[in-house]
Amino acid sequence: MRRRETFRLAAGGSVAGLLSPRIARAEAEVERARRGLPSPKIQDVQVINTAPRGLRLCVVKILTDQDGLYGYGCATFTQRADLVGPAVERYLKPFLVGKPADRIDDTWQALYNSSYWRNGPVLNNAISGVDLALWDIKGRQAGMPVYQLLGGKLREAADCYSHASGNEIAETLDNARALMERGFRHVRIQV
């Protein structure tokens, strides 16, 4: 092999290495088009306020233009749950309707960076609900749980914790012990 041929092959390999992610994305788009699955567009954004066991939760539901394709995301900020819903409905919804549901990172960046003050806890929780709902849509489209889309299972189970509080330190400690007797290995204490 001559020097020029070696250089040409090496250069070709480098270019192919740079282009391969783009080619893979393009091939995926072609495959999607062949299957007749256009990119879903966000048609509506709804807020569901709920309070299991008295804990106020705000859930975001995103509906797409594809029949039966929707996603749920939790936008919980229990201290200001009554503000998260209006943030989704009045601020985020007008921006989201009509946008592609499969451009998750693009959407997150636009929502996060669109506010002069970089949002704060209420709007950040609203954005997290939208983000989770969009991932739920992608998982439903793929026919698999979101954790598989993100690389698969890391462990079989995850430890949960509970919260112990009380009016006095002794009461708080008693509540923590009771939780540990119920099987919790981790207890958050607030004095």
What are these regions (language model features)?
Residues 3-26:
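N-terminal export signals
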Residues 20-53:
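C-terminal segment of N-terminal export signals and the immediately downstream linker at the start
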Residues 49, 77, 191:
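Residues that line or immediately flank small-molecule/substrate-binding pockets and catalytic motifs
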Residues 53-56, 128:
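Short, basic and Ser/Thr-rich N-terminal targeting/leader segments
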Residues 58-66:
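Short beta-strand elements
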Residues 65, 69-141:
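Metal- or metallocofactor-binding catalytic centers and their adjacent structured scaffolds
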Residues 131-165, 171:
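Glycine-rich, aromatic-flanked loop segments that form ligand/cofactor-binding clefts
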Residues 156-191:
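Metal-dependent enolase-superfamily TIM-barrel catalytic cores that perform enediolate-based chemistry
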